[in-house]
Amino acid sequence: MASTRDIRRRIKSVKNTRQITKAMELVAASKMKKAQQAAVAGRPYAELMAQMLATLGDRVEEAQHPFLVQREVKTRGIILITTDKGLAGPLNANLFKLVTDIQSPAKYVVVGRKGAQFIARTRRDLLAEFQVSDRAAFAEVKVVVEFMTKQFIDGVVDSVEVIWPRFKNTLVQIPTIAQLLPLRGVQHAVESLQHGTGVSAPRSPAVEAQMLFEPDPVSVLSALLPLYINREVYHQVLDAKASEHSARMVAMKTAKDNATKLLDDLTLEYNKARQAGITQEIIEIAAAQFAAAS
């Protein structure tokens, strides 16, 4: 049995660990709420964009915008959204399984240090690495999107897909892969907006009649599609941030609970060791008294 001094040292260490994991759990919970609030705050913007795209789709034939051009896919472009830090449970590992399943030629743009390390370790083709802060500003995401869309327009990649952890609830984050480019049409973009954010785009004739597009609907559509692409990836980054903080909150809660259980076990072990020591001292005193009396 370990000495009481060793057990006390272990108890102190476990208490410190439990305190740290509890603090990290609370921080992750706060950040998760902020990411969810940011995603909800973007819904009015997404709803208006869906309505505008739906109206434009009715008024113009789909122009040969570079984002709409379908071509043979020889090289896939993948935007991989991961975390910068660890301690997020199996979140990143589940995303890496999706990457491992990709057998066709692909080039990667990675958001997050963990993803960049994985791509480098597995010797995949890394085009660029970006970091996005916890607050995930739109301008930060826009830089990522502009880089990847340029690769698509220049023919470096023939399609663009996004891999990210989709937030379902606090306990469930689903590793997801979705095509971003080329777009499958304006109507598909509208449906993607509605499905991705839960918004609706009511087709009100009165509202549509009030929409004037200058200089012309085709030009507006050409300007609106890049905004749509930026908004899609921005929403996916917010989704990934909520998933990251949720996974970390759950992981830290599990660690805290395990530390509490270990602390209970160590306290019991300490009490047993202390009791054994006291009993041994009593036996030795009694034996000494018996020997003296004899």
UniProtKB/Swiss-Prot annotation:
It is a peripheral membrane protein. CDD domains: F1-ATPase_gamma (cd12151). One of its GO terms (cellular component) is proton-transporting ATP synthase complex. Keywords: ATP synthesis, Cell membrane, CF(1), Hydrogen ion transport, Ion transport, Membrane, Transport. Its main location: membrane. It is found in: Cell membrane. GO terms for molecular function: ATP binding; proton-transporting ATP synthase activity, rotational mechanism. InterPro entries: ATP_synth_F1_ATPase_gsu, ATP_synth_F1_gsu. GO terms for biological process: proton motive force-driven plasma membrane ATP synthesis. Produces ATP from ADP in the presence of a proton gradient across the membrane. The gamma chain is believed to be important in regulating ATPase activity and the flow of protons through the CF(0) complex. Belongs to the ATPase gamma chain family. F-type ATPases have 2 components, CF(1) - the catalytic core - and CF(0) - the membrane proton channel. CF(1) has five subunits: alpha(3), beta(3), gamma(1), delta(1), epsilon(1). CF(0) has three main subunits: a, b and c. This is ATP synthase gamma chain. It comes from Opitutus terrae (strain DSM 11246 / JCM 15787 / PB90-1).
